[in-house]
Structures are given as structure tokens and as C-alpha cells.
Amino acid sequence: MSENFHILLLNGPNLNLLGTREPETYGHLTLNDIVQSLSADAQALNVKLTHFQSNAEHELINKIHAARGNVDYILINPAAFTHTSVALRDALLGVNIPFIEIHLSNVYSREPFRHHSYLSDIATGVICGLGAEGYRFALQAAVNRLS
């Protein structure tokens, strides 16, 4: 069904602190827990999943650029860059790879500055507020769209 698809999972700043950073907002799972679970799901779907996390905007942009011609779909939790990064937006537009924006928390139930995303209007879809399960939904949605 999904043979040979390559999906890139990108996680932005401070997500390396998951499990200990504001667990009442982001949950108790670590980023490694989420990635391991998603990798197992990807394997079951016969999809190659590559993961990269960085606290540096330029490193995420470089990964997006390198994905051009090599990746079929991007799943991205841009974290705080959601609300600030025109550069990340331009990189995603530049490579023309479909992507799904993911947020662990419901950004619309939080501070007003979190209500704006520079990425949502160019994303295939946005998943927020469903915790780590949102990553699974995004993976399945990407595979469905590619199949």
C-alpha cells in the first residue's frame, strides 16, 4: 500500500525537553518515546520515517532543503517557530513537499501570541491539542494522501 514512501518528521525548539517540561501542558512522554512509537507505526505501514529535532531554526531549514527530491511528506511540530518563523515558511514553500503541522497542546486555548501560525495556511492539515496521538494521526493522514 505505502511501499517506498519516505516521511520526514521534524521537531522544533524545546521539544527535546518533553517529559519534564510543563508536563501538564505537553504530557509525560519524552520525544524519544514519541519517535519510537511513531517509527514502529511507520514500519507497520511500510514507510521510511526519518526524524530530526533541533532548537536552531537554520538546522531545520537545512533539513527541509535537503528533503527536496528525497522525501514524499513532512510532518512538522515547529514548536515556538510556528509563531515567528517566516524563514521556515519560505523553506517549506520552496521545496514544495506537502506537510502536516502538529502541536501537542491546543495552541488556541493558550496565550494569544500562540494563536497565529506562519505555517497553517500552507499546510495540508493542522493537528493540535491531541497530545502525542496527534503524531500518529498525522502519519496515517500522510500515508493515506500518498497512497
Curated annotation (Swiss-Prot):
Keywords: Amino-acid biosynthesis, Aromatic amino acid biosynthesis, Lyase. One of its GO terms (molecular function) is 3-dehydroquinate dehydratase activity. Gene3D superfamilies: Dehydroquinase, class II. GO terms for biological process: amino acid biosynthetic process; aromatic amino acid family biosynthetic process; chorismate biosynthetic process; quinate catabolic process. InterPro entries: DHquinase_II, DHquinase_II_CS, DHquinase_II_sf. It comes from the Bacteria. It catalyses: 3-dehydroquinate = 3-dehydroshikimate + H2O. Substrate binds at N77, H83, D90, L104, S105, R114. Pfam families: DHquinase_II (PF01220). The record marks R21 as: Transition state stabilizer. Pathway: Metabolic intermediate biosynthesis; chorismate biosynthesis; chorismate from D-erythrose 4-phosphate and phosphoenolpyruvate: step 3/7. The active site is at Y26, H103. The keyword Lyase applies. Its EC number is 4.2.1.10. The keyword Lyase applies. Homododecamer. Catalyzes a trans-dehydration via an enolate intermediate. Belongs to the type-II 3-dehydroquinase family. This is 3-dehydroquinate dehydratase. The lineage of its organism: Bacteria, Pseudomonadati, Pseudomonadota, Gammaproteobacteria, Enterobacterales.
